[in-house]
Regions:
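Glycine-rich beta-to-alpha transition loops that act as phosphate-gripper elements at the mouths
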Residues: 1-2, 53-56
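Histidine/acidic-residue-rich, glycine-tolerant segments that coordinate divalent metal ions
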Residues: 1-34, 85, 182
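Short amphipathic alpha-helices and their capping/turn segments at secondary-structure boundaries
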Residues: 6-13, 63-72
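Short acidic active-site motifs
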Residues: 6-8, 36, 61, 156
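Anionic group-transfer/hydrolysis microenvironments
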Residues: 23, 81, 172
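His/Asp/Glu-enriched, well-ordered alpha-helical/loop segment
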Residues: 32-50, 54, 66-78, 83-168
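C-terminal regulatory/interaction regions
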Residues: 154, 163-189
Length: 189
């Protein structure tokens, strides 16, 4: 989006509540107009999706966003394409050829084409930022998305009666086991 701050204020009045892929394919913060990105800092109704891979949004901008919104208004996402977890090489996204390297997916033009980010890697990057705690990661990766899409009554936290979708991770946030509705869906070998 190229929305200006005034446009974002109007959009919020019309019901907009989320910025998709914050900082990507949108105007940046400028000293004459803070645009869509800056609107997250001033409009408490908004939440922002972040692709925390250090490529779509660099560490300094991730830190700036966290410092100005806290974990309550950030939703961690991956925007991962189907080549996530596969070897570097040539793939396709929406009929377009995509080149996947060790850390990114891009079109021949060099434009980013989704990501190959795994959520645990994004969580580790966020946790490495100043002031971010494990409780913040849980909120940004689980609680906030579940609330935003209206499924918090059964997803997003560990409570009696919920679906028992759980991750078992080590101290470095590497996934060891995944449970879906109480059943083991993945277990590290």
């Amino acid at each position: 989006t190229d929305a200006f701050f005034e446009d974002m204020k109007k959009a919020v009045k019309q019901g907009v509540r989320q910025l998709t892929h914050l900082c990507n394919a949108m105007n940046g913060i400028h000293h004459r107009d803070i645009g869509a990105v800056g609107s997250l800092f001033f409009l408490p109704e908004l939440k922002g999706e972040l692709i925390a891979d250090g490529i779509h949004v660099n560490r300094e901008m991730l830190q700036l966003i966290y410092n100005n919104t806290g974990s309550d208004r950030i939703i961690l996402i991956t925007d991962a394409m189907r080549a996530k977890g596969l070897q570097p090489g040539n793939y396709e996204l929406g009929g377009q050829p995509v080149i996947v390297t060790e850390d990114r997916a891009q079109l021949e033009s060099g434009s980013l084409a989704g990501s190959i980010l795994k959520m645990d890697a994004g969580a580790r990057l966020m946790l490495s930022l100043e002031g971010v705690k494990i409780e913040d990661i849980i909120k940004m990766a689980s609680v906030n998305p579940a609330k935003q899409i209206g499924v918090y009554d059964r997803k997003g936290s560990i409570t009696v009666g919920k679906d028992a979708d759980l991750l078992l991770v080590d101290d470095a946030l590497h996934i060891k086991k995944t449970f879906c509705r109480g059943f083991i869906a993945y277990e590290e070998e």
